[in-house]
């Protein structure tokens, strides 16, 4: 018990195994008390946090590996959601300011980059399936080689936040660029369309960019380009499902009317899909030359 108290005083994360009545005080005091399920006394089992049903110490190592994998998936899940939402929030903020400066209006209302219903679609459908798929991703093979993370370390490290804002800023830039290129009142108009078409083009580009962005976060801290893409397909499959549902929202009349969308020309669909994958480039470059600390 004195040894446990000394380790706790040093700020260590302490786990202890025990099976006897005399182990109960220490099992109760440590962060994680582990009791033997077969040989352990009822008092030790009651005082512990975990019970080894097979009395095999190797099970503890397996539990730590799985726990680290779960924590890493939570980090990726949170960072992925922040990245997509940062891009849309920035685009809405900048787009609203520009619409006010240049008096871009629909009737008496400012012309916004996206509608509330379209943003809701992105949060529930575009990000929903990939975010759930992150929980199914297996831990990296080298997850046990990392040192224990500090208890007071944040969930997202500084480098992770930089990665979030870089990829989110790219999503923002893609949305504003497509809106300007397709709207008849834009600065550098390439395809002269009304605001309905331009907004649909921007909506589709952001959706594809956010889905490709899931690949940026899928195997952090490594790039998906240098690791086994086919090792774990939960996230890619979820992205394909979300992409298919988005196509249905654009080309299926009832959904299209609900979300104020119009059909896109096929060549534009291909073009905007290609633009969406541009979010992969800054993500790869950041991981290649700067790197992300997962702060385990």
Where would I find each of the regions flagged by the language model?
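C-terminal transmembrane module of polytopic membrane proteins
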Residues: 204-296
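Membrane-embedded transport module
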Residues: 1-15, 35-221
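Proline-centered helix-kink/hinge sites
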Residues: 25, 130, 253-254
């Amino acid at each position: 018990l004195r040894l446990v108290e000394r380790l706790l005083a040093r700020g260590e994360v302490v786990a202890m195994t025990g099976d006897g009545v005399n182990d109960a005080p220490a099992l109760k005091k440590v962060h994680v008390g582990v009791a033997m399920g077969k040989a352990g006394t009822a008092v030790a089992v009651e005082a512990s946090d975990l019970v080894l049903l097979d009395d095999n110490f190797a099970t503890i190592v397996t539990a730590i590996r799985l726990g680290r994998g779960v924590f890493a998936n939570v980090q990726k899940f949170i960072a992925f959601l922040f990245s997509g939402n940062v891009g849309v929030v920035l685009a809405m903020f900048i787009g609203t300011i520009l619409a006010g400066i240049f008096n871009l209006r629909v009737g008496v209302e400012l012309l916004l980059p996206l509608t509330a219903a379209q943003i809701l679609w992105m949060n529930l459908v575009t990000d929903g399936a990939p975010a759930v798929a992150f929980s199914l991703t297996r831990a990296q093979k080298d997850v046990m080689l990392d040192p224990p993370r500090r208890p007071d370390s944040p969930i997202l490290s500084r480098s992770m936040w930089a990665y979030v804002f870089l990829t989110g800023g790219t999503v923002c830039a893609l949305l504003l660029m497509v809106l300007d290129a397709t709207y008849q009142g834009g600065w550098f108009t390439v395809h002269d369309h009304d605001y309905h078409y331009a907004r649909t083009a921007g909506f589709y580009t952001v959706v594809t960019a956010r889905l490709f962005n899931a690949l940026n976060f899928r195997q952090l801290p490594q790039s998906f380009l240098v690791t086994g893409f086919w090792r774990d397909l939960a996230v890619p499959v979820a992205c394909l499902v979300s992409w298919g549902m988005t196509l249905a929202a654009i080309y299926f009349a009832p959904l299209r009317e609900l979300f104020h969308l119009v059909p896109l020309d096929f060549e534009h669909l291909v073009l905007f899909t290609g633009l969406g994958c541009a979010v992969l480039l800054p993500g790869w470059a950041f991981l290649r030359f700067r790197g992300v600390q997962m702060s385990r």
